[in-house]
């Protein structure tokens, strides 16, 4: 409660209006502003953002487009946002890191990057602090929740209400990291352009080979077990760590589970370990360095990365495990269903069944050829995405197409005209019959001809 009160004081002290001075309109500051956490911020989105920016540099995008990076984002930055044609805003489910970024998405044309489809905790935090945007987001989510009928969505409580709907429908473009994200947004009628961009490779393959010696040391510290299972990432209840701990007891001696990652307030894996009597078979390694995190992955025979409830996120830990060539066990839900079938083993969605998980892990333990096959396929897939610069190219396309949209001189006029038609009682059926179409056709005269469009494309490609 003290944290909520502090946040409330912070919000109440924030000006609710932004003064934009003459001469600071779109483009006066630059083409694009990229706003999101960067290292050493203690969130996985920080390393993600660093990898994205490095990729855009490698492909020469930042030589062609004026793009600035902003972190941290504070209330004092509010007046800057309207000076850019487009903001690329990284949004996660944490008020501490994403409050001002979320606000910024309402101050300028926005390309929103959704790291969590379910912004439930974020929106509740806004409401608890009395932030008007929180109430607007909650109202929109409640209005649209009946549109979501996918059984996989209904199974996962945080996804049942589209908490992201308000900001997504306000945005000019949206980036998600799997096709599940695109399907989820389509499920409640989003018409904003959606771009599916894969999670970036955080490291190159050499990072895992150089981690191998440290990995052997860490494996030895766990008793040098014949079969080492690593559960990487934030330690929380949704990772189904309690079920993993109990499955370790079923596996018996010769297997060891290492839980490695950041501690999250409100969950302690030690309680589950004690309850299962698995102290000798499970170890906890909290808040390790990034180097040791990679070393644990390099040392692992298998990785377990489960989710229930699922929030529609793509797991950065799973991406790293695939890069390391480690076979992984995941939940058959949401974004995990978009991972190639030959790179992972899946357990049933919902609360993890201990006996099923133990059976799958025993299968991996006893079949070295299967482990090698899955790990090699995972590494090939990750390397294919990395060498293609799939993430950077995806961002390039999303930013370029969204910039073209916001620069279109007919777009705003069309939006105003469309609203006027609605106010006048014109329905979609009436539009199909031709009502209001003469003005819309006239606006097409603002579109560049083929020669101009080709010239613009060549200019954008030139260094």
Regions found by a protein language model. Name each.
Residues 34, 223-239, 245-248:
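Conserved donor-binding/catalytic core segment of Leloir-type glycosyltransferases
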Residues 232, 256-270:
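Glycosyltransferase donor-sugar binding loop
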Residues 144-145, 269-291:
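Nucleotide-activated donor-binding/catalytic signature segment of Leloir-type glycosyltransferases, i.e.
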Residues 172, 297-312, 326:
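Acidic donor-binding loop of glycosyltransferase active sites
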Residues 327-331:
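Short hydrophobic beta-strand element within catalytic cores of glycosyltransferases
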Residues 154-194, 201-203:
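A short, active-site helix/loop in glycosyltransferases that binds the activated sugar's phosphate group
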Residues 2-24, 380, 384, 388-463:
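C-terminal amphipathic helix plus adjacent low-complexity
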């Amino acid at each position: 409660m003290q944290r909520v009160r502090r946040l409330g004081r912070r919000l109440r002290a924030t000006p609710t209006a932004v003064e934009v001075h003459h001469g600071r309109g779109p483009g006066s500051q630059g083409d694009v502003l990229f706003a999101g956490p960067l290292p050493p911020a203690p969130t996985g989105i920080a390393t993600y953002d660093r990898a994205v920016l490095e990729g855009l540099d490698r492909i020469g995008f930042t030589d062609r487009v004026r793009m600035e990076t902003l972190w941290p984002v504070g209330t004092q930055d509010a007046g800057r946002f309207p000076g850019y044609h487009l903001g690329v805003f990284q949004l996660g489910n944490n008020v501490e890191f994403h409050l001002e970024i979320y606000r910024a998405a309402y101050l300028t044309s926005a390309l929103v990057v959704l790291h969590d489809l379910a912004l439930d905790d974020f929106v509740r935090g806004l409401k608890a602090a009395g932030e008007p945007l929180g109430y607007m987001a909650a109202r929109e989510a409640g209005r649209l929740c009946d549109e979501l009928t996918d059984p996989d969505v209904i199974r996962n409580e945080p996804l049942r209400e589209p908490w992201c709907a308000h900001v997504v429908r306000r945005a000019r473009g949206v980036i998600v990291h799997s096709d599940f994200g695109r399907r989820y947004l389509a499920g409640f009628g989003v018409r904003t352009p959606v771009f599916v961009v894969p999670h970036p490779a955080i490291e190159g393959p050499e990072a895992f080979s150089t981690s191998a010696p440290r990995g052997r040391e860490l494996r030895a510290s766990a008793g040098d077990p014949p079969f080492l299972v690593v559960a990487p990432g934030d330690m929380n209840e949704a990772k189904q760590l309690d079920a993993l701990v109990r499955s370790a007891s079923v596996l018996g001696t010769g297997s060891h589970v290492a839980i490695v990652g950041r501690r999250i307030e409100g969950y302690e894996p030690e309680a589950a370990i004690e309850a299962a009597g698995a102290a000798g078979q499970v170890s906890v390694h909290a808040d390790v360095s990034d180097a040791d995190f990679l070393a644990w992955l390099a040392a692992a025979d298998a990785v377990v990365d489960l989710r229930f409830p699922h929030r529609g996120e793509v797991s950065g830990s799973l991406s790293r495990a695939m890069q390391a060539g480690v076979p992984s066990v995941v939940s058959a839900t949401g974004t995990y269903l978009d991972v190639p079938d030959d790179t992972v083993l899946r357990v049933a969605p919902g609360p993890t069944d201990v006996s099923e998980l133990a059976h799958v892990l025993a299968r991996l333990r006893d079949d070295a050829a299967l482990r090698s096959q899955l790990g090699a396929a995972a590494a090939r897939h990750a390397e294919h995405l990395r060498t293609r610069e799939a993430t950077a190219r995806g961002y390039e396309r999303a930013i370029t197409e969204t910039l073209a949209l916001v620069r279109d001189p007919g777009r705003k006029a069309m939006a105003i005209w469309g609203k006027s038609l609605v106010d006048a009682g014109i329905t979609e059926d009436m539009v199909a019959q031709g009502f209001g179409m003469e003005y819309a056709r006239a606006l097409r005269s603002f579109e560049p001809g083929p020669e101009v469009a080709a010239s613009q494309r060549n200019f954008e490609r030139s260094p």
